[in-house]
């Protein structure tokens, strides 16, 4: 399905990201993963095993460093012949306080890891997709982007901005054979989330692998007519 395609998956060593990496590799893509902890990438490679890991590549990269991201993605395109797919999974949650008690430092941190990383990755990848004559972008937003709650303003604002980014990309690239879509998960069924909320009904949570299959559809040939969409992937959560 994705043979000959080159994909970048940010946040690819995390629970959702690694499921996306596995799914894209299984579909035949070559996958490149930026990481901040080499041991996490080594663990990912070991868990994937051969032969899938033979099509896995990556490098240490600060996704908030514009110059470094531009250089790294240019190197990916040079080494692998281009960039066809970008999946922006990198991000993180912080909350717990109402707006009037939330420091600007926390706002900045949430904007940096959830929005800036995606903006810089899109800006660096799109020129290489244009050179290839097409591509697909999937940005991970959140249910919180459209259904806010108490004490999550900074995170929700950053994820809401991801939707605007996605819509802008779709409008700008619609005549260039490049699609841009967003997915909106809620609580994902991961060991860390189970440990953090042991009394929750975990059967209502969505497995990372299920979300990864939606990503696979969005970057595949059957989704070429879909762009600018924000797709809920939170099931009963």
What kind of feature is each model-predicted range?
Residues 142:
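Residue(s) in the substrate-gating loop at a strand-loop-helix junction
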Residues 27-44:
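Conserved glycine-rich Rossmann-like NAD(P)H-binding loop of the short-chain dehydrogenase/reductase
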Residues 127, 170-175:
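Alpha-helical segment proximal to the catalytic Tyr-Lys
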Residues 97-99, 106-111:
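Substrate-binding pocket helix/loop in short-chain dehydrogenase/reductase
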Residues 13-14:
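Conserved glycine-rich cofactor-binding loop
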Residues 122, 158:
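Active-site helix of classical SDR
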Residues 175, 182-183, 190, 200-237:
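C-terminal helical subdomain
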């Amino acid at each position: 399905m994705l043979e000959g395609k080159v994909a970048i998956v940010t946040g690819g060593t995390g629970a959702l990201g690694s499921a996306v990496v596995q799914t894209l590799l299984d579909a035949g893509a070559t996958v490149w993963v930026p990481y901040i902890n080499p041991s996490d990438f080594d663990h990912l490679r070991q868990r994937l095993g051969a032969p899938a890991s033979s099509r896995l590549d990556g490098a240490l990269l600060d996704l908030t460093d514009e110059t470094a991201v531009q250089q790294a993605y240019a190197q990916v395109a040079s080494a692998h012949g281009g960039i066809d797919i970008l999946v922006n999974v990198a991000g993180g949650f912080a909350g717990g306080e109402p707006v009037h008690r939330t420091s600007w430092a926390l706002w900045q941190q949430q904007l940096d890891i959830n929005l800036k990383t995606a903006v810089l990755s899109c800006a660096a990848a799109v020129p290489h997709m244009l050179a290839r004559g097409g591509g697909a972008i999937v940005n991970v937003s959140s249910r919180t982007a459209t259904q806010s709650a108490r004490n999550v303003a900074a995170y929700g604002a950053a994820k809401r901005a991801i939707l605007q980014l996605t819509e802008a990309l779709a409008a700008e690239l619609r005549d260039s054979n490049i699609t841009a879509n967003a997915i909106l998960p809620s609580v994902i069924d991961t060991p860390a989330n189970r440990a953090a909320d042991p009394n929750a009904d975990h059967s209502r949570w969505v497995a990372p692998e299920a979300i990864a299959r939606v990503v696979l559809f969005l970057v595949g040939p059957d989704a070429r007519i879909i762009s600018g969409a924000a797709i809920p992937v939170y099931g009963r959560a």
